[in-house]
Amino acid sequence: MISLSLAACAGQQDQNFGPPAAAPTGLSQADINNILSGKSWRWSGPNNSGVTLYASDGTSLVEVTGKGTTTGTWTAKDGQLCEAFAPAPFLPKGVPMNCQPMTGSGNVYHVGQATFTLA
């Protein structure tokens, strides 16, 4: 996304459009823990959507819209949300731990290609 913004600006010289928009900032491990822990988050990605409850003990309960529920584990590490999911009828092999950058603020966050909003 940044490269697209830079490419768009390259052809516009000597024009002042005001201060640049703030880029999303990375979050610390403590930030991610405080944001997610004990709360339910509605998420939407390219292939699925649903709601996840992130428990403070590092477990999660995941409801995938139209597919069912599964459990998982989560942790924060180096500005990333790391998640693994247990097998379920719609997810026969489960998903091993995978980490993706988490950015955002307020009640809207981005994890990989998914958008999270407070449920």
Can you describe what each PLM-predicted range is?
Residues 1-7:
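Sec-dependent bacterial lipoprotein signal peptides
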